C-alpha cells in the first residue's frame, strides 16, 4: 500500500538524509560473470533499447565503416542514410561471440542473409545493404550531409503527434513479431559464450582481440579488392 506520502512530503522531511540505492545497474567492478553481464545489459542492450524507444524519429548518417557497436547504433535509428563508400559488418564471431549484443540481425535482414552476414563476418556494402532493405538511401559521400538535412527538414514539417504515433505503431509491430524477445534470448546466448570463453580460454573473449580482428578485416578487404 502506498499513500503517496511514502515518497516524501515537501517541506517536512526534505532535510532527512537517506541511504540512496539505485534500482538499475551502476557497477562494473563485481567479480565473475556479473561484471560483463551488468555492463553489457545496461551500456549495450539497454541503451540501444532506450534509443529505439525515443518518441522523436532518429536518423543514422553513415559513412565509412559501421562495425559491431557502430552497427547497433545505426540499427536503433528509424532511418539509415549512407554514403556510397560505407560498409556494414559484424565480425565478432571471430572473438568467440555469436553477434553483437543488440541482436537485430534477423529483423534488419532476411534470415538467410543475416546468417551469411554473421557466419562469414564479411563487409556488406551500402548498396547491398540498400538492396536488402537495411538502408533507406545511398548517396555520394559529398551529398550525404545535404541529403540527411533534406530528410530532417521533411520530418520536422510533419505533424508531431502523428509522426510520434506512427513510430510507436511501427515499433509495436516489430515487438509483436518477437524482436525484443528474440534479442533478450540472444543476449543470454551471448553471455553463455562469454562464460565458455572464460572457462576454456581464460578470457571472456576468445579468438581475435580487437587489434587482431581489425588487422584481419583489413587483410580481408584488401584481398576482396
Regions of interest found by a model, annotated:
Residues 1, 8-9, 13, 18-20, ...:
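C-terminal alpha-helix plus adjacent terminal tail
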Residues 1-46, 212:
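Glycine- (often His-adjacent) and acidic-residue-rich active-site loop
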Residues 19-23, 42-43, 76-79, 97-100, ...:
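A broad, low-specificity signal for short, low-complexity segments enriched in glycine/proline
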Residues 25-38, 95-99, 115-121, 172-178, ...:
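Low-complexity, flexible helical/coil segments
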Residues 34, 38-45, 142-145, 160, ...:
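Non-membrane alpha-helical structural segments and their capping/turn regions in soluble enzymes
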Residues 40-41, 58, 190:
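Polar/charged side chains located within well-ordered beta-strands of beta-rich proteins
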Residues 49-161:
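Crotonase-fold acyl-CoA enzyme core
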Amino acid at each position: 500500500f502506498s499513500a503517496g506520502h511514502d515518497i516524501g512530503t515537501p517541506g517536512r522531511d526534505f532535510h532527512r538524509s537517506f541511504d540512496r540505492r539505485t534500482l538499475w545497474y551502476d557497477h562494473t567492478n563485481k567479480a565473475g560473470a556479473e561484471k560483463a553481464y551488468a555492463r553489457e545489459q545496461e551500456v549495450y542492450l539497454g541503451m540501444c533499447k532506450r534509443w529505439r524507444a525515443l518518441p522523436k524519429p532518429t536518423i543514422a548518417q553513415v559513412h565509412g565503416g559501421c562495425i559491431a557497436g557502430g552497427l547497433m547504433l545505426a540499427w536503433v535509428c528509424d532511418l539509415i542514410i549512407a554514403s556510397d563508400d560505407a560498409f556494414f559488418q559484424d565480425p565478432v564471431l571471430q572473438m568467440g561471440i555469436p553477434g553483437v549484443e543488440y541482436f537485430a540481425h534477423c529483423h534488419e535482414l532476411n534470415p538467410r542473409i543475416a546468417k551469411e552476414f554473421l557466419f562469414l563476418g564479411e563487409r556488406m556494402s551500402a548498396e547491398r545493404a540498400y538492396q536488402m532493405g537495411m538502408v533507406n538511401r545511398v548517396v555520394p559521400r559529398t551529398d550525404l550531409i545535404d541529403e540527411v538535412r533534406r530528410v530532417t527538414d521533411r520530418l520536422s514539417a510533419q505533424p508531431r503527434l502523428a509522426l510520434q504515433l506512427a513510430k510507436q505503431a511501427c515499433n509495436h509491430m516489430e515487438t509483436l513479431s518477437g524482436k525484443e524477445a528474440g534479442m533478450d534470448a540472444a543476449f543470454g546466448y551471448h553471455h553463455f559464450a562469454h562464460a565458455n570463453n572464460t572457462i576454456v580460454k581464460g578470457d571472456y573473449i576468445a579468438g581475435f582481440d580487437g587489434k587482431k580482428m581489425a588487422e584481419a578485416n583489413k587483410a580481408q578487404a584488401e584481398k576482396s579488392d
